[in-house]
A protein has these predicted regions:
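Accessory beta-strand-rich segments of carbohydrate-active enzymes
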Residues: 31-35, 42-45, 101-210, 232-233, ...
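Short flexible loop/turn segments that cap and initiate beta-strands
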Residues: 52-54, 236-242, 283-289, 648, ...
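Bacterial Sec-dependent N-terminal signal peptides
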Residues: 1-30
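Extended acidic/polar, glycine-enriched regions
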Residues: 165-166, 226-316, 679, 685-686, ...
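Short, hydrophobic beta-strand segments
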Residues: 160-162, 270-279, 677-684, 777-797
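Extended carbohydrate-recognition surfaces in non-catalytic/accessory domains of CAZymes
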Residues: 28-129, 187-190, 578, 635-637
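Extended substrate-binding grooves/exosites of carbohydrate-active enzymes
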Residues: 43, 67, 71-73, 144, ...
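Beta-strand-rich structural segments
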Residues: 225-229, 291-293, 643-647, 692-693, ...
Length: 821
């Protein structure tokens, strides 16, 4: 089993070497194993499987992260819920068939892993760290119980030293997902990573380092580091801690050594000065590393590295939010944790792809709705430049679902908040904590007390960041002073309350913690084109003219107006960045709908038209000119077919078959006319539409064309990656488009496509973004939706080349090579 010395983040490794049983990284006195491969898995209840002698040879062999339910099949009876959704304006309960995705995640299952940790010898300490397990994990080592947790979204650690053996060890983990425990698809299984950390008895515990930057200016930054030490059991007269801070180039920029004498509290506190600090921001995500070395009796006992950033955040009444002294508004999205066709199983390449899409849109912030994020997401946000609102709960004591967090709150809430903060408080991307989302406790007598209880825990564990919560019962929250207690009052879907709330609240600021909830299906256009609330159609789709929304929500433009007009509103987090499994509003009762319509980007990762509306608003540095809709509407000849342009240019002219339809300019007449250019009365005729954009001086600066498509002729493949790492985990996403003989997208094509991967890669999953599709993600075939779908391929551990071929009856086969190295 090989070992390498590497850099760590948050006291944990960010580079892991695959070995026979697991990955391993080793520093002086510390070795970490990633238990990734050769797990045995079975659904059902097998309490006898805790025994090392248990025969699991007939169980499925899996690698983790693993989501046991994502392969389906879809069924409207899976976790169907007879509930009344108050936010939807419902007066009575009704059967919701796709609320949690229609996947078979309810039930019990077991995982087993037999591993060897060569670094574990007599006198060593062993800790098991689980980043997340869905849900109610109970952990057994070598036949004996060692610990448990309840909340499936949280990270937790267990000291397994007393049950660990030199040589072979058997780890068994039981999990159980209850019915009616969620409002969206939660995933199932060991969907995040599992680590075994071996140290000396004298060591620094998991999350034992806490880094803050209390003083920052252009000349220097003061970096304060508090480091805990595990209690001593040896005859050491003194401990000393050496900390070295290095920049991204590996250059030492500060260092300090401190001695801890016998009788002192087991915590070091150090102050280091970094000259001319390079500050962290979404635009410049500069990072530093604090290398920690712990000595006892002159002997090096522990060594690891914590990545952090230097940045200042302020939230000021009347002025709003500033980062590094620059006032700005959050251009954020809310995201659930599933990765579309991959389910809840975490994958760094999939997360990075999501973030790259959001970055191109101009997004600079993410709300981890409605739970703790995977550490990989937080790390990527540090590196790529996204601010994070890290959220904890969807329920407090008042329930929303039958078996939700309300049953856990009294026993687990403080433990869960503490773990959430300790796991994420060194990350510069994290700029606020959220303690809840739309909790019914807003309206109860006890709600304010619960809020203060949770907020006080956050302040105690991390006084450097404010606390918010997403409120939807605004009148109640204002009348009973619930909203007054929060550091940052978060409003969900209430832009028209901002003015009154600002007058009544003491904070002097408001956050749009959840906004818009516009619904649309990529490539679908409905007529007539008018704003509509909870509009439903026979095909279970929603229009991409982006004027349809929910009972509680608005179109994007309404929120834009308030964000632009009110200085004290500090930004927004749109619901949602990506479509997700579950919550198919407005079709909650209309199977086969089983995934959301809210996303700016669909479940396959293809941007909807709305992406370009947000891009035109949020990313002014990059030109945006996008035409809505496509121009292939057989049977609509002579009928009114509005054309929209989403652009950051002030005006544009529309041409249909080279005939001008007039120039439109943005105006403040309505919310939509401020942010969209609209030709509402044009009539459809086949051919070509062209939009020419003009700058502020009236000069033509950009144009875009859309042509009427002919019959499907061939397939075009486009990959987001040209080269993959040969690590057995890296992913490429290939968009397959059905086009006519001239290369125009066939926007209604539903051809069934088949996929084959040869060479040094494997087929992983496919998705088409259709919320009604019951085709299974893991099978190598699927119908195109509105002419497109996305195939995901995975590298092997052997370098070379993989080849993807996509075929369909009557169409020319397309082949795409991708290098792996």
């Amino acid at each position: 089993m090989n070992a390498i010395k590497i850099s760590f983040y948050r006291g944990l490794s960010n580079l892991l070497l695959a070995a026979l049983f697991c990955g391993t990284v080793q520093g002086q006195g510390r070795t970490e194993y990633l238990l990734e491969k050769n797990w045995k898995f079975s659904k059902g209840d097998f309490p006898q499987s805790i025994s090392p002698a248990f025969d699991d040879s007939k169980w499925e062999t899996v690698s983790i992260p693993h989501d046991w339910a994502i392969k389906g099949p879809f069924d409207g009876n899976n976790d169907s819920q007879n509930v009344q959704i108050v936010q939807n304006g419902e007066k009575t309960a009704s059967l919701k068939t796709g609320r949690t995705g229609g996947l078979p995640f309810v039930g019990k299952a077991w995982y087993r892993n037999t591993f060897v940790a060569p670094a574990f010898t007599k006198g060593k300490k062993a800790v098991l760290l689980i980043d997340g397990a869905m849900s109610y994990p109970k952990v057994f080592l070598n036949g004996e119980a060692v610990g448990h947790w309840a909340y499936g979204y949280n990270s937790f650690s267990i000291d397994i030293t007393n049950k660990m053996k030199v040589g072979k060890n058997t780890l068994a983990i039981s999990l159980e997902n209850l019915p009616e425990a969620s409002r969206w698809y939660p995933g199932a299984g060991l969907y995040r990573n599992v680590h075994v950390i071996i140290t000396d008895e004298v060591s620094i515990p998991v999350w034992g380092t806490y880094i803050t930057t209390p003083v920052i200016n252009k000349d220097f930054a003061r970096v304060k580091i508090r480091t805990q030490v595990n209690a001593l059991s040896g005859n050491y007269t003194a401990l000393s801690l050496q900390t070295t801070i290095v920049n991204a180039k590996g250059e030492t920029v500060a260092s300090a050594t401190k001695t801890l004498n016998e009788g002192d509290l087991n915590e070091f506190e150090q102050d280091l000065i970094v000259r001319k600090p390079e500050l962290w921001s979404p635009e410049t995500p500069n990072l530093y590393a604090a290398i920690t070395k712990l000595y006892a009796g002159g002997s090096l006992k522990d060594e690891y590295t914590t990545t952090f950033g230097i940045r200042s955040i302020k939230y000021e009444a009347e002025k709003g939010f500033s980062l590094n002294g620059v006032y700005r508004k959050f251009k954020g999205v809310c995201n659930h944790h599933d990765l579309g066709p991959l389910g809840a199983a975490i994958n760094v390449a999939a997360l990075r792809r999501q973030l790259l899409l959001l970055k191109d849109m101009g997004c600079d912030a993410i709300r981890t709705s409605h739970n703790m994020p995977a550490p990989e997401l937080v790390k990527l946000c540090d590196e790529m430049g996204f601010m994070l609102m890290v959220e904890s709960f969807d329920e407090w004591k008042a329930p929303k679902v039958l078996n939700g967090y309300s049953h856990l709150f009294d026993e687990w809430a403080e433990k869960d908040i503490v773990n959430m903060i300790h796991a994420n408080r060194n990350n510069p991307s994290v700029v606020m904590w959220s303690i809840g989302n739309e909790v019914p406790d807003q309206s109860t007598k006890e709600g304010g007390k619960i809020l203060k209880f949770l907020q006080d825990i956050c302040h105690r564990e991390d006084p450097t960041r404010p606390v918010t919560a997403g409120m939807d019962r605004i009148k109640d929250a204002l009348d009973n002073n619930f909203a007054s207690v929060l550091d940052i009052p978060g409003f969900n879907y209430k832009p028209f309350w901002y003015g009154e709330a600002y007058k009544r609240l003491p904070q002097g600021m408001i956050l749009g913690s959840e906004t818009a909830s516009t619904v649309s299906s990529r490539g679908v256009y409905k007529f007539p084109v008018v704003p509509q609330k909870m509009k439903m159609y026979d095909d279970n789709q929603s229009s991409s003219y982006d004027l349809e929304y929910c009972n509680w929500s608005q179109i994007p433009d309404d929120e834009f107006v308030m964000q632009d007009s009110l200085k004290y509103v500090i930004g927004e987090f749109v619901w949602t960045g990506f479509d997700y499994l579950g919550e198919p509003t407005p079709y909650d009762e209309k199977w086969p709908s089983h995934s959301s319509y809210f996303g700016i980007i669909d479940l396959a990762g293809i941007p909807k038209d709305r992406f370009y509306l947000y891009r035109s608003k949020w990313n002014p540095e990059k030109p945006t000119l996008h035409i809505v809709p496509h121009w292939t509407f057989p049977g609509r000849e002579g009928q009114v077919t509005p054309v929209f342009a989403y652009t950051n240019y002030p005006s544009a002219e529309l041409f249909i078959n080279n005939k001008s339809q007039g120039r439109q300019s943005k105006s403040k007449a309505t919310s939509t006319s401020r942010y969209r250019l609209m030709w509402n009365n044009v009539k459809y005729e086949p051919g070509e539409i062209k939009v020419v954009a003009y700058d502020a001086n009236g000069k033509p600066v950009a144009e875009q064309k859309v042509k009427t498509a002919g019959k499907p002729h061939h397939i075009v493949l486009a990959s987001d990656r040209k080269t993959l790492m040969a690590d057995g985990k890296d992913l490429a996403y290939i968009t397959a488009s059905v086009v006519d003989a001239n290369g125009n997208l066939c926007p209604d094509a539903e051809n069934s496509l088949s996929f084959k991967v040869t060479g040094n890669g494997t087929y992983k999953v496919v998705a088409n973004g259709d919320a009604t599709s019951l085709e299974l993600f893991h099978l190598p075939k699927m119908k195109a939706f509105k002419g497109k779908l996305v195939i995901t391929v995975q590298s092997t551990e052997k370098a070379g080349q993989l080849n993807l071929s996509v075929s369909s009856k009557g169409l020319k086969t397309a082949v795409l090579p991708i290098e792996t190295k």
